[in-house]
Amino acid sequence: HVRSRRQRQMCIRDSFGIASVAEIIAELRAGRIVILVDEEDRENEGDLVMAAEFVTPEAINFMVTHGRGLVCLTLTEERCRQLELPMMAARNGTRYGTNFTQSIEAAVGVETGISAADRARTIQVAVARDAKPVDLVQPGHIFPVRAVPGGVLVRAGHTEAGCDLTAMAGLTPAAVICEILKPDGTMARLPDLVDFGRQHNLKIGTIADLIQYRSEHESIVKRVGKRPMQTAWGTFEAVAYEDAATGSAHLALVHGNVSPDVETPVSYTHLRAHETRGNL
């Protein structure tokens, strides 16, 4: 399954001229806008994405004129706490669990809040290093979305990708995103996005590639301990792991020697803590 997914990613990359993760990061670091596409079995849409700290009125105007979607600001959980942003709804009923906070506006320096200049100003205020809750008012014309800890390795959304990519670029982990619609108001799909990118000289990246890149270069799971464990089938080595993003624990029972050069059979079972002993 993993191999077939990677083969599909390579085919898409070759067929549509998809940029590498490194190229997308370089574009964001340079203050340019990119297109980011998620999976066909998810929202199957492309968003315009740029690093929030480089936002300009011209960039906002481009997004609303050519992207036509909702201008959102991806923020980390930490930044949302810093700004004391309440969630938009107590119960999130959206299909993909997008974590909208209440919409925001800069407290000073804006007029009605809807102009490109006003929206850029609001974003600049929200991502300033020393930003405080009093710097913003609610509601407003910018829609923050809160990324889950762990980023795309936990949730494969544009929200998490925006924060991940800007952080990987060495920038403030926040991005301005806007969905791309076709002139008739329907969602632009990959072939449409390729044409759009060529028309506006924008590079296209995929969230699938970002997930693969992060999976190959880092891990959110760390080993916290191990000990021998006697079972009805002999002695196993019990290895405990902790998920750094969620704090949840995982237990691996290993029998024999494990080598990266030899394919190792793996069996995955989900047990509650009180069920573990009775099943060993």
What are these regions (language model features)?
Residues 194-198, 202-203, 207-268:
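Long, charged alpha-helical interface segments
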Residues 41-42, 51, 61, 80-82, ...:
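Extended, low-hydrophobicity, polar/charged segments
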